[in-house]
């Protein structure tokens, strides 16, 4: 093969990435129109479409390269020269970091995830020190309260690109000021100014204004979820100003934002200040660059594994019937491998399990299903695997292992954020913490169901608790769409003996679910049962689930809030939330700073 071929291949890959990201931005740019037109089904379709774009364009490039090389095999030296040529194209390229991930994806598709070495791939960035702070145009605009906070906020809201009328802008400004006063106090607020991102962040049925509350000694998040009323008018639903609240909004269990980001690396750096607890991978994930997030996630893993003296161990909790789960004690992720054989009661296949994980990737996760990264041919050093875990892997997933002497290769696994299994959490807490956990658990089931997801296996062990106390579902092998389930009420027994029989006295078909039976395992614990019955008794009735199904089949898309209901302005300020009401903060207008 000629020397010029390496450059042609490198240019072809980069042009393929340009095409992919151009389509990514095109789909993203439609978010405003979808929001304004309340086309919520189009929102869901666009989310799936944008996820599929990446693999589609990788496939197109792979076919081009096979034509260019006429299907001939390539030697190691040739591949190294291709990477060198590609690297030389990147110093002036604005999205170099994601272009590196795209190169990796093309390589993996061409060579079936074999020979994944730093020499052939961008395992590490070619430009780790390249800053994103020098930009052709600012990512955000500063607003100062020289004429008071009412005027400042009026300017912020008026500058938004949304073309709908406001339901009551003066009322919402009053709410925001009252919320800021409660959070900071008037004196501190008077020393602050706002920095607001130029682009809105769209997700579900909200357009999020994302900003920074800049104080003399610190910077806080400033997040406003803007909603559209049924009458087509805009209103602000709440104001969030803590790092914990912002972390939940940008959480790993939520769908990706639609935010127009020609320079995603710069946006990630800008967000980092208000999301200090988020890793680089999580920030790229939040803005929809999920494939590059996978690259960053792997880099974070390598950074940890090369500096720790820990061994992989089986993850705490009840051992699963489908997945073998392991972790590093100090690492915040778990590794999940599909077993070779499932427990007899699990009538699913490995292909079905993988399809379920893909469904979760593409579906609206409503803050209640953990996102995952999928890896092939994942290499582990044997000396970093506890003997008990290694024996378990060989026994339960031996068909997915390749022994390389001092290392093993796992042909397929998922990496997911680690949480405390809910069953362990419930054993450890009491009082209000127990009540909160039971409430969260029921709310998770409700919100999943409203999003057309039936969890299937709702045992506590299949849910986890995040560091913010939220309950998240993470066992996907039995999930299905709500519309595929036949919810039934158990018919009354024909004779007294029926209730004592080992077999049911009624017919059961595939897809039948009897919510009354949930009580047997959800309410068996005397500490938990009364709380569940108090807060979530309707989940034990078939008619509750059938009513939800009817709403879904009629096209209803439920509102999803990334904050508690009590934080909504309509709840906090109650009677003052009428559309025609002008709300005045308790202490009047915030005074201007000197």
Curated annotation (Swiss-Prot):
Reaction catalysis annotation: L-seryl-[isocitrate dehydrogenase] + ATP = O-phospho-L-seryl-[isocitrate dehydrogenase] + ADP + H(+)
Residues that hold ATP according to the record: 315-321, 336
EC number in record: 2.7.11.5, 3.1.3.-
A GO CC annotation given for this chain: cytoplasm
Localization (cell): Cytoplasm
Molecular-function GO terms, alphabetical: [isocitrate dehydrogenase (NADP+)] kinase activity; AMP binding; ATP binding; phosphoprotein phosphatase activity; protein serine/threonine kinase activity
InterPro entries in the cross-refs: AceK_kinase, AceK_regulatory, Isocitrate_DH_AceK
Keywords for this protein: ATP-binding, Cytoplasm, Glyoxylate bypass, Hydrolase, Kinase, Nucleotide-binding, Protein phosphatase, Serine/threonine-protein kinase, Transferase, Tricarboxylic acid cycle
Broad class of the protein's primary localization: cytoplasm
Catalytic site positions: 371
GO biological process, one term: glyoxylate cycle
Similarity-based family: Belongs to the AceK family.
Function, as annotated: Bifunctional enzyme which can phosphorylate or dephosphorylate isocitrate dehydrogenase (IDH) on a specific serine residue. This is a regulatory mechanism which enables bacteria to bypass the Krebs cycle via the glyoxylate shunt in response to the source of carbon. When bacteria are grown on glucose, IDH is fully active and unphosphorylated, but when grown on acetate or ethanol, the activity of IDH declines drastically concomitant with its phosphorylation.
Protein's name according to its UniProt entry: Isocitrate dehydrogenase kinase/phosphatase
Naturally occurring in which organism (per UniProt): Klebsiella pneumoniae (strain 342)
């Amino acid at each position: 093969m000629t020397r010029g071929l390496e450059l042609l291949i490198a240019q072809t890959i980069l042009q393929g990435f340009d095409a992919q990201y151009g389509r990514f931005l095109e789909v993203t740019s439609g978010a405003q129109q979808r929001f304004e037109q309340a086309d919520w089904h189009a929102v869901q379709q666009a989310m799936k479409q944008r996820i599929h774009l990446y693999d589609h364009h990788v496939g197109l490039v792979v076919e081009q390269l096979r034509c260019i090389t006429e299907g001939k095999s390539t030697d190691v030296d040739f591949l190294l020269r291709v990477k060198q040529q590609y690297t030389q194209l990147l110093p002036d390229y604005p999205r170099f970091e994601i272009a590196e991930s795209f190169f990796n994806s093309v390589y993996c598709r061409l060579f079936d995830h074999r020979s994944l070495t730093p020499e052939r791939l961008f395992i590490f960035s070619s430009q780790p020190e390249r800053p994103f702070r020098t930009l052709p145009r600012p990512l955000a605009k500063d607003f100062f309260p020289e004429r008071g906070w009412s005027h400042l906020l009026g300017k912020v809201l008026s500058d938004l690109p949304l073309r709908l009328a406001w339901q009551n802008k003066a009322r919402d400004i009053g709410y925001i000021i009252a919320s800021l006063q409660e959070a900071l106090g008037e004196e501190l607020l008077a020393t602050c100014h706002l920095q607001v991102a130029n682009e809105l962040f769209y997700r579900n049925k909200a357009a999020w204004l994302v900003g920074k509350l800049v104080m003399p000694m610190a910077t806080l998040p400033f997040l406003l979820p803007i909603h559209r009323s049924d009458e087509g008018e805009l209103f602000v639903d709440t104001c969030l100003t803590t790092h914990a609240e912002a972390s939940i909004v940008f959480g790993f269990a939520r769908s990706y934002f639609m935010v127009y980001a020609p320079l995603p690396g710069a946006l990630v750096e800008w967000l980092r200040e208000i999301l200090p607890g988020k890793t680089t991978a999580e920030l790229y994930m939040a803005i929809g660059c999920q494939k590059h997030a996978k690259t960053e996630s792997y880099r974070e893993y390598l950074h940890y594994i090369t500096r720790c003296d820990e061994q992989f161990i089986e993850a705490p909790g009840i051992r699963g019937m489908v997945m073998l789960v392991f972790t590093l004690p100090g690492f915040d992720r778990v590794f999940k491998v599909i077993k070779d054989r499932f427990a007899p009661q699990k009538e699913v296949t490995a292909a079905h399990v993988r399809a379920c994980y893909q469904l979760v990737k593409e579906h609206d996760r409503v803050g209640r299903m953990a996102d995952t990264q999928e890896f092939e041919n994942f290499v582990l050093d044997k000396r970093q695997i506890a003997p008990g875990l290694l024996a378990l892997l060989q026994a339960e997933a031996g068909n997915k292992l390749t022994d390389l002497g001092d290392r093993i290769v796992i042909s397929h696994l998922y990496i997911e954020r680690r949480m405390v299994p809910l069953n362990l959490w419930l054993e450890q807490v009491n009082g209000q913490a127990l009540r909160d956990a039971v409430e969260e658990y029921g709310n998770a089931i409700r919100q999943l169901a409203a999003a057309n997801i039936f969890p299937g296996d709702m045992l506590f062990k299949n849910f986890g608790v995040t560091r913010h106390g939220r309950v998240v579902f993470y066992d996907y092998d039995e999930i299905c769409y709500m519309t595929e389930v036949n919810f039934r009420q158990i018919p009354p027994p024909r004779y007294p003996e029926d209730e004592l029989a080992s077999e049911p006295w009624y017919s059961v078909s595939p897809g039948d679910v009897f919510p009354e039976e949930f009580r047997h395992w959800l309410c068996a614990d005397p500490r938990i049962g009364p709380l569940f019955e108090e807060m979530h008794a309707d989940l034990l009735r078939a008619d509750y689930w059938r009513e939800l199904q009817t709403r879904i089949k009629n096209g209803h898309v439920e509102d999803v809030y990334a904050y508690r209901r009590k934080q909504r302005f309509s709840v906090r300020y109650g009677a003052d939330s009428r559309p025609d009401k002008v709300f005045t903060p308790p202490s009047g207008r915030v005074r201007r700073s000197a």
